[in-house]
Amino acid sequence: MRKRISAIIMTLFMVFMSCNNGGPELKSDEVAKSDGTVLDLAKISKKIKDAVEFAASVKEIETLVKSIDELAKTIGQKLTKDTGVLAADANNNNGGLIAGVYGIVTDVGTKLDGLLKVNGISEDIKTKINDSKSKGTAFLSKVKGDDDLCKKDATDAHAKNAIDKNDNTGGKGKTELIALNTAIDELLKAANEAVEAAIKELTAPVKAEKPSQNN
């Protein structure tokens, strides 16, 4: 994200260097391109800033969702005292792990609700947020309605059926979790595209002048 912000600052600098103040009188936050196009830098800069902040919020949500993959790797394992090494645990105590994942997806839903309140987001992005919310809700409904998962001694097999995307059986949340991942990926892609679109307002090429028709 820091690299992106640095690139934006450099872009703004290049715009200042490439624009001139000729032609009509300009306001303090305006510059004119050589073709006469007037850019409102304050407005465009805010648009870029808002888009970058929104994309960062989506990235935070994506990181939460992807963290479930790491948690799935700890199914059937326990921490070894002193060494901190993960070792096999044959006691099938995965209820706490399932509860943790449930909490993460619940938090994801709350954060998605917050994104819907952001001013100025496109209808396409709103649709993708709502799609992500529905996918998260479907996962939560699947998990909380399963007797095999809602207990302390949830088995390794059942836990994998729920939160391991590589599990061959599934049936307890895996399909819904994959759908949530896909929806969040699409939302992040759209958010990044919004940043690129905002930047392009600064970097759009100058319109070529049409050749004169007079002889």
UniProtKB/Swiss-Prot annotation:
| Species this protein is from | Borrelia hermsii
Under the heading InterPro entries, the entry gives: Lipoprotein_OspC (IPR001800), OspC-like_sf (IPR036437)
Q: Where in the cell is it found?
A: Cell outer membrane
Cellular component per GO, a single term = cell outer membrane
Q: How does it sit in the membrane?
A: Lipid-anchor
Q: What else is known?
A: Genes for both Vlp and Vsp families are on (usually) unnamed linear plasmids in B.hermsii HS1.
UniProt keywords (A-Z) are: Cell outer membrane, Lipoprotein, Membrane, Palmitate, Plasmid, Signal
The protein's name is: Variable small protein 2
Q: Where is the signal peptide?
A: 1-18
Against SUPFAM superfamilies, the record matches this protein to: Outer surface protein C (OspC)
Work out whether the entry's keyword set contains Ribonucleoprotein. Answer: no
Q: Which family does the entry's similarity section mention?
A: Belongs to the variable small protein (Vsp) family.
At which residues is a lipid of type N-palmitoyl cysteine covalently attached?
A: C19
State the source organism's domain of life. Answer: Bacteria
Lipidation residue positions, type S-diacylglycerol cysteine: C19
- Name of one Pfam family that matches: Lipoprotein_6
Role noted for this protein:
The Vlp and Vsp proteins are antigenically distinct proteins, only one vlp or vsp gene is transcriptionally active at any one time. Switching between these genes is a mechanism of host immune response evasion.
